[in-house]
Amino acid sequence: MGKYSLDLKEYARLAREVAAESCVLLKNDNNTLPLKKGDKVAVFGRSAFNYYKSGLGSGGLVNTKYVVSILDALRNEKDIVLDEDLLEIYSEWIKENPYDEGHGWGTVPWSQKEMKVEDYILRVAKENDIALVMIGRTAGEDQDSKNEAGSYLLTDVEKDMIKKVSKSFRRTVVVLNVGNIIDMKWVDEYNPSAVLYAWQGGQEGGNGVIDVLTGRVNPCGKLTDTIAKNIEDYPSTKNFGDPERNYYEEDIYVGYRYFESFAKEKVMYPFGYGLSYTSFDIKGKLVESTHEEIVVEANVTNNGNMSGKEVVQVYIEAPQGKLGKPVRALVGFKKTGIIKPGECEKLIINIPKSYIASYDDSGVAGYKSCYILEEGLYKIYIGADVRNAEESGQYDEKFTIVESLEEACAPIVEFKRIKPILDENNKFNIENEEVPMRRINPKERMFKNRDEEIIYTGDRGYKLADVFENKVKLDDFVAQLSYNDLICMFRGEGMCSPKVTPGTAAAFGGITESLRNFGIPVACCADGPSGIRMDCGTNAFSLPNGTALGCTFNVDLVKKLYKMTGIELCRNKIDSLLGPGMNIHRNPLNGRNFEYVSEDPILTGKIGAAQVIGIQEAGSTATIKHVCANNQEASRRFVDSIVSERALREIYLKGFEIAVKEGKARSVMTTYNPVNGIWTAGSYDLCTTILRKEWGFDGIVMTDWWAEANTEGEKSTRENKAPMVLAQNDLYMCVSNSLENPENDNVKERFEAGEVTRSDLQRNAKNILKFIMKSQAMLHELNLISKEDLEEINGQDDDGNISLEDIVYYYADKDSNDIIIDASNFNNKKGDSEVFGISLNELGLYNIEITMKSEQGSLSQLPLSIYYDNALKSTITIRGTEGEWVTESRELGFIFGVNHYIKLYFGASGLDIDKVVIKFMGKGKLPF
């Protein structure tokens, strides 16, 4: 098999294994699970018929050849008997209560209407041995969850269903097909005998869940978030959702760091928790402590009667010192292999001291802007979750400066944060302290550290291939580029640029004729992270969501899965997947938590790095996102994250730091929102001081799509892109035409005024070019891919053929030669296609004009792909028009013959079309 051969069976096997290992068993009274051979199974809940493979928004828009739901997988089981009469009752009810898809982007309901479980239904099902109750939830981009029934809370109908079924069946299993954790108080109230978080497992998700329910896979997933009794128990809830300022008053005490320190009694299920069908004993010890790391050993013994895996988790309790610390902090973890009953596996876990160090943002410990280890006794806890980890060693540490840095991204708005204080009963209470304010001027720092300008030479005949082959220095190559070339390179083009793989997010690099003449290839990126989004309808593999990946605690398995995704990217000529998502689960209501991993930064970093490494091993790369503090969807373009520098570094940036330093990430995406008054897309201290100077990052930084920036103290605008250039945010994503500057950005204006210099533009261009020279695009440009591998890439199956039967034809007007089509009744839901024929009077040049609108906001992404005789001509991605009609025109080119057909493919719901015009542009010149 060649380098780009994609073994779809192995891909599916790995995805299924991840989906299974992600399942978290919270409860299993009296060995309710696994299902037993011959079990008669009653399935309740419409979610059995409406499986959520992923959440909403760009992270979930993956077209797939198939999706295996939990019900599909159940029906494939030969050793259990499904109650088909009960399923038929649901099927008939669903016909009268169809799936509600909402109105497109950001409007899909969090859940679907549920059927009431009447007494007669229970009588129908009473002969079964076990009941499976399916609960489904979704949320996503531009759509936070809410503390309401049908979202974070169960509806009355759902609660009644669980109550009645749990009373009627000796064995009741509630399966949660959700992206985020939800309220769980109903478990204590209705007492189902088993509860399983199944997450959103991608296209193989159903198979993975059934592997666990049947016992083919022993559940080994662990919670990546603390499940508290009430949403109000999370300290971030107080400020979550504010449209203007979100104060991070809880500081570093996020998730279990807060609950284990201050509120253990408010926890239902602790971080890292998850049951197995067997029992394990973990005996851990500290092996050694050196200047660089600590080494721990854990012996894991299977004391039960079923083979399975276990996760060893290592926590630290650092001395409070002057800074204050959480009572527990995860510093390492490792998953065992399959351990047979009675057998033992020894694990060695190496933990860098940098994972243990604390950042002094005030100087109270004597070393401001340093990561330090305060003097005192450090206790090690090893176990299967944060609550049950046992003390397994301790060591004394002298005061140590681990890393000396400089202040960056500190707040400018005064507020208070929490800090532990020990009372007379040896219990930690909350004390409030003032957060240190910013003392440096980032603008002065930026101008002081400007790169030296490379003198412009004009075209000397150098091509990028000469740099690639070490014949010419990169600076000499860049010296040829005019300021207009450099500005154009700053602007990525998209969405769905015709210059790269159809339906993808953006093109960048050699996107103008001038840049192409220098031998700069056009690179491509596609939305992720749970698979490749291609809005033209091209199929890709849909993967388990980010939370599911985290719950595996299996770094090696995640890496293997994403190596397959890397091969898939290469086969589709995509140079970077826009993922992994690595923001912190600060609050359970964040709509995009499904894309992200955990409330813990170390786990987030390790799982994110595994995805990056896997993709890069295959030859493509990943874009880690969103840097940083992008922790709510409400008002995501404008809400200012007011956060201490310590919390930024220890919590919200730490995972990204691990992905850069350990995963060798080469691409980063900033956020929509400001952090401490500066929009991240234009934050020099974020994009340069921290990312490049401190972490050693040498890749590209790109904005989120249609992001804004501000000059500090002023409002943000989309036109004000000069701060992005100055900050070393290399790529603005994205515009329809880089050369024409359709958004009227101010980069050229600020260049001519002297605020943006040639050296700023050259520096950013060098970053882009260095990235491209390591990309698949460069290998294609230089014909460095073997004939065998090219055949593998170009020989993929095309399953987009159109049936010509029953196509309605529209005929050209005799006078104008135009065809006007009333499109008001077109099927326009996500995944729909409209196919129609056109019959022309004249050979010649034609355009297609489409008049359309959307009620959604300007950050909505509504792709519409245009096929002409089964060839993709263009994909239009419009943003929400807030109800205003707009007309988009695309070239069809020179058309021969009379009869042809057009297909419109809707990549998202919510786009209304008024009319389609096939516009005759003239006879033109024959193209031969």
Please place each PLM-identified region on the residue numbering.
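Glycoside hydrolase catalytic-domain context in secreted enzymes
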Residues: 1-388, 406-849, 863-895, 899-928
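Short beta-strand edge segments in extracellular beta-sheet folds
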Residues: 395-404
